[in-house]
Amino acid sequence: MAQHAVYFPDAFLTQMREAMPSTLSFDEFISACQRPLRRSIRINTLKISVADFLALIAPYGWSLTPIPWCHEGFWIERDDEEALPLGSTAEHLSGLFYIQEASSMLPVAALFADDNHPQRVMDMAAAPGSKTTQIAARMGNRGAILANEFSASRVKVLHANISRCGIANTALTHFDGRVFGAALPEMFDAILLDAPCSGEGVVRKDPDALKNWSPESNLDIAATQRELLDSAFHALRPGGTLVYSTCTLNRQENEAVCLWLKETYADAVEFLPLGDLFPDADRALTPEGFLHVFPQIYDCEGFFVARLRKMSSLPAMPAPGYKVGAFPFTSLKGREALNVTQAANAVGLLWDENLHLWQREKEVWLFPAEIESLIGKVRFSRLGIKLAESHNKGYRWQHEATIALACPTHAHAFELSVQEAEEWYRGRDIYPQTPPAADDVLVTFQHQPLGLAKRIGARIKNSYPRELVRDGKLFTGNS
């Protein structure tokens, strides 16, 4: 594999020599950093099993190598990448997989390391959504995830990825993560803090990642990380699990931040060793039980992961000063809720007791039940999924609800051919040889829901959102 020129500040190299264990070769570290990063994907098990996905793509000639710490993760090699980018394949568009760097699958693997089943989880720095969607898959779309993102421009991308993957159990917020310890004390069973960092581990993806690097900036970043970790630890319930991770390599932003928490709260903090997380995990194990992944160890990005348990309650932080404002939704119950549920079921949209119906004017929404106790405590950017808009003749079902809730074996399901599916993704109406009998059609491809549409005579009217429409080649092996 060809090498590329990476910019290394001299002070960074000195710091890495000091941080790297004697069992690792510094020359191999430099060599690994200069190799392009292997591509990797994670199969979305909310939509398809690993076995069924592998069978589906078997004719494509993709070479998949299992990632040892993630059962549904694979390194991928393709011969047709230039002709058909991975992100434009039909399987990606329908949410069957997520393009995710292998190392970044580690934090969620650690969060669920003891086969725990948290009901309320926070992803404190969630965009673009790789870890939020991975958490949702591990939870089976049940319980609730509070996915927070401080950067306003990245919240939209976060929602788009959550929607594409068919996730229904998520609430989005847009806050500085330092507010949660005070705003939501001891409200979460598990928390992932994939902290903002200096990004020293990503040079294989971005050779210029260290252009603005300095030892002083590392210390400034570590100060912010301590405040975020403190907030996360206060938001965690006693007995809960917290994973702290970064994509950087220096000790100040990694081990030192975790040790600061231990020094601050003593016996309330327990480090949970990760040496048994996967075969060969001990190659990256620190004396504290953390994983400090230098890129040459597993041929991936540099990464750091620590797993903590909160052993006892902490004194509350000062109450937050912001105002939440009036909540604009009302709960739907009784006959109203039954009418919506029956109408949705009739077109193939199904949900269970984990989701509750709420209304705002003509909009009907589904909120995860586990998030309802947080209403009034924080302001949400988006909560649950928008199910429908009501009008005089019934309901206009929303695309994100179809992707998350539709049953592909429903009587109104209509499976498209490859050519018809390409037309659908391009935003064009479908003219099938044998039109469906029903007026309301659940359009599917590869037995995955693509949308709800109306049959008008012999034509299926395209309902694919305009902002998602694609051009060009979309299907492997189909010219």
Swiss-Prot record:
GO biological process: rRNA base methylation
GO molecular function: RNA binding; rRNA (cytosine-C5-)-methyltransferase activity
Residues of the signal peptide: none
Highest taxon listed in the record's lineage: Bacteria
Pfam families assigned to the protein according to its UniProt record, in alphabetical order: Methyltr_RsmB-F (PF01189), Methyltr_RsmF_N (PF17125), Methyltranf_PUA (PF13636), YebU_pre-PUA_dom (PF21150)
Entry-linked CDD domains: AdoMet_MTases
GO cellular component terms attached to this protein's record: cytoplasm
Keyword RNA-binding in annotation: yes
Keywords: Cytoplasm, Methyltransferase, RNA-binding, rRNA processing, S-adenosyl-L-methionine, Transferase
Regions that span the bilayer: none
Annotated Gene3D superfamilies: 3.10.450.720, Vaccinia Virus protein VP39
Subcellular location field: Cytoplasm
Catalytic activity: cytidine(1407) in 16S rRNA + S-adenosyl-L-methionine = 5-methylcytidine(1407) in 16S rRNA + S-adenosyl-L-homocysteine + H(+)
Keyword check for Transport: no
Documented EC number(s): 2.1.1.178
Binding site residues for S-adenosyl-L-methionine: A125, A126, A127, P128, G129, S130, K131, E149, D176, D194
Residues of the active site: C247 (nucleophile)
Record family assignment: Belongs to the class I-like SAM-binding methyltransferase superfamily. RsmB/NOP family.
Role summary: Specifically methylates the cytosine at position 1407 (m5C1407) of 16S rRNA.
NCBIfam families attached to this UniProt entry: nop2p (TIGR00446), PRK11933.1 (NF008898)
Protein name: Ribosomal RNA small subunit methyltransferase F
Organism: Salmonella typhi
